Amino acid sequence: MRFSAIFTLGLAGTALATPLVERAGSSPTDIISGISDKTDALDSAIKAYNGGDPSKVESASADLISTITKGTDAIKSGDDISTTDALALPEPVQALTKKVEQAIDDIIAKKDKFVEAGAGGKVKDSLNQQKSAADGLASAITSKVPESLKEIAQSLSAGISTAIQKGVDAYKDVSDSAPSSSAGSSASATATGSASETGSASTTGSASATSSSVIPTSSGAASSSAAPSGSSTPTGSGSASATSPPLATGAANKATIGYSLGAVAMAAIAVAV
């Protein structure tokens, strides 16, 4: 309030002699009024937001930024701000600053909802754009007021930028990119070596060697069939598979003798022939 009084008193001496020329739609007060309306619209959208689609808030923010930018361009391209117009600025600027502060407080309060909706990064970008636009407006106004009032005008209009900076700081830890990618790379190279080599090549003597049968008959007294399969598992299969080692018996000894005599007999026959 003291600042507003100083600003007003500084202009009072020359304001009485200056006629009020209203530039409809392009005067600083009109520009501030338009920005104030857009700020109200943005704050209403923020208050109404409870999660989900944030497009209404984004649209209202874009409208505000556009209005500030257009107002800044109008001030830059226009005439210098007269003492009378400058005298009319403190009250609407201070009112606008309060509205901006309220909107920023509301958008900070809804931070978790915006982040959950994946819009935290967009809100942060919008706040940065608002801050940049507000800085441009403050610079434009300051450049157009009388030299003796530039410092005061800069301090007054910078209040809006300060308010927005609070929101920028609140969202600075939010990721710029919205959506989050959960690329979980899993390498499951499992080498299962099931080379189980079962040596079941059991030579099974299915011939019941008796004392009367000295020479093996055609039924095959001892069949040793080691048939290698595709899994490299040598298996010996006879007519009767014995899982225990063969017992050394007298009958086995006789069978061995019978085999030997049979071999000699066969050799003798071959020679005789």
UniProtKB/Swiss-Prot annotation:
Functional description taken from the UniProt entry: Constitutive protein of the cell wall. Antigen target of host humoral immune response.
Organism lineage string: Eukaryota, Fungi, Dikarya, Ascomycota, Pezizomycotina
Organism: Aspergillus flavus
UniProt GO molecular function: lipid binding
Recorded name of the encoding gene: mp1
Keywords carried by this UniProt record: Cell wall, Lipid-binding, Secreted, Signal
Record has Secreted as a keyword: yes
Identification of the protein by name: Cell wall mannoprotein 1
Annotated region described as Disordered, given as residue ranges: 173-247
Example of a GO cellular component annotation carried by this entry: extracellular region
Listed PANTHER family: CELL WALL SERINE-THREONINE-RICH GALACTOMANNOPROTEIN MP1 (AFU_ORTHOLOGUE AFUA_4G03240)
Family: Belongs to the cell wall mannoprotein 1 family.
Compartments reported by the entry: Secreted, Cell wall
